[in-house]
Amino acid sequence: MQQKIGTLRLALTFAGCFLGAGYVSGQELWQYFGAFGARGLLGLALAVVLLGGTGVLLLRLSARTGIETMDALIVRADIPWLRTAVGVLTAALLFGVVCIMAAGIGALGNQMLGLPVWLGAAIACVLIAAAAYFGLGGMVSVFTVAVPCMIVAALVIAGIRLHRTELTAAAFAAGDTNPMLGSWATSAVNYAAYNFFATVGILAPLTRHLKKPGTAVCGTVLGCVLLLAVALGVLAALATSPESTRAPLPMLDLACRLGAAGVVYAVLLFLGMFGTSVSSLVAVLTYAGQKSAWLAGHRTVLLLVLTAAAFAGSLFGFGDLIGTVYPVYGYLGMAAMLLVAEHAVHARRAGNNRAATGD
């Protein structure tokens, strides 16, 4: 990456870390925010502010220390076992994403084709494993094109729905919420924390490529505005269609109610989920190979075991997995956020001390 990153590019990259298939499917946004009614909108604002603040903090910490690896940014002290634990937890989160995306494809096949969910998930796992086995991780860049297309499609569908259906205050009544998320406030913090934990390794290496120091703040703020705009559009549209919120893929259900838009959205969702799952599985395989020579030499066996485990995990269902895996990592992510904040304070004090002594 030789080209310097400006404000707009950083904003798109920052937002792209969160605007995945789970986000624009509507399931994730509804569980974390929509289910809490009007207060959920306050939670959304809080989550975006936290993501923006921690994003800037992370970029500045990386710039100040020169550290780009996730484990060293989170764990300041050189404690090998603790840094390894962070790496293992990250790999486990990526594996959880594979399970969630496989379940999502299974739900998609059920909604669009009437296939049993388990069969759709099984087919998805076979395709994901094949892509990983034949070294097609690089082709994931092709599938990532589906993400911005999904964002545009989601906003268009939301706009059409809102144009046809009047949005009233009653539409934002609170519904059934996930007990693991507690109140709207804890749900917001949890959402910000698990997303922060999942993207530390993506954002940190960008620091040395920024055009100027101020780009970190401006780009992150603009990215937050984009996140907020998409989320508000999705939540407002779903608020007018309570029946869609009960579907595994709420925005797909809403799109199908608008006619042919459902087919287009289904294809985009499939590409987005498939790309996310392949890249996540390849990352897990790569990490395992780096940590163990035996696993590196038995990559195929490891791939088969992970695929079987991912299929088993997918049977818990797309909505239930999002409502369980993400909250668990959200609480772990809270610890990661605090550790990064502590690291940032320590680095700033160390810099001030060096400046005072003239070193």
What is the predicted function of each stretch?
Residues 177, 238-260:
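Membrane-interface interhelical connector segments
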Residues 21, 95, 128, 149-176, ...:
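Hydrophobic alpha-helical segments and their helix-loop junctions in multi-pass secondary transporters
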Residues 46-71, 233-237, 241:
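Juxtamembrane transmembrane-helix boundary signature
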Residues 71-77, 101-121, 208-228, 280-304:
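Helix-loop-helix connectors at the membrane interface of multi-pass transporters/channels
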Residues 5-24, 43, 91-94, 98, ...:
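Hydrophobic, membrane-embedded alpha-helices of multi-pass small-molecule transporters
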Residues 3-8, 32-59, 217-219, 224-229, ...:
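Extracellular loop-to-transmembrane helix junctions
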Residues 104-109, 116-123, 131-162, 322-340:
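Membrane-interface loop-to-helix entry segments
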Residues 2-5, 35-39, 65-93, 111-117, ...:
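Transmembrane-helix boundary/entry motifs in multi-pass membrane transporters
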